[in-house]
Amino acid sequence: ATGGGLAPFGQEVEATIPALRRYARALTRDRDIADDLVQDTLVRALRSEHLFHGGELRSWMYTILTNLNRNRLRSLARRPILSPIDDNDAPDLAGPEGGGRDISRALAARVDEQREALLLVVLEGLSYREVAEVQAVPIGTVMSRLARARAQIKSYLDGERPTLRRVK
């Protein structure tokens, strides 16, 4: 680096900060958590420059951020719930083996993966191929996640409007 500036790789990484912030804030819905996530992403990227083998830097950065966020969510899921739950209000998903927790986590993860895909396509303008690389899944999986996410949004929005029935 000349004159105390960043090396070219660092400059390219720095240029992704606004997009990373936008994605992280949409993903976490919390400015402080998003800023921490972006900072951790930048540190990880700069330390892992040797692992970047060319290609689309922005997609690589989104991959790092997405993985860090998934790790954060897994860590939160392992923490005990501090507020008491009234067993009479909640359906018994656990069954005799107590596997309900796994079902809940699987459902939450699926929804998060759909949100990630939708945000990367709609908010960040990534192609389906780039989203597939970020999420480390086949492109068909991305297409399915997007279709389900869009259907859920449509269903939610339709539920917000008054229902009108046709009278014949």
Where do the language-model regions lie?
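Short hydrophobic short-linear motifs embedded
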Residues: 1-3, 8, 82, 162-168
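Sigma70-family region 2
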Residues: 2, 40-57, 75-76
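Acidic, proline/glycine-rich intrinsically disordered inter-domain spacer in sigma factors
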Residues: 4-7, 75, 79-108
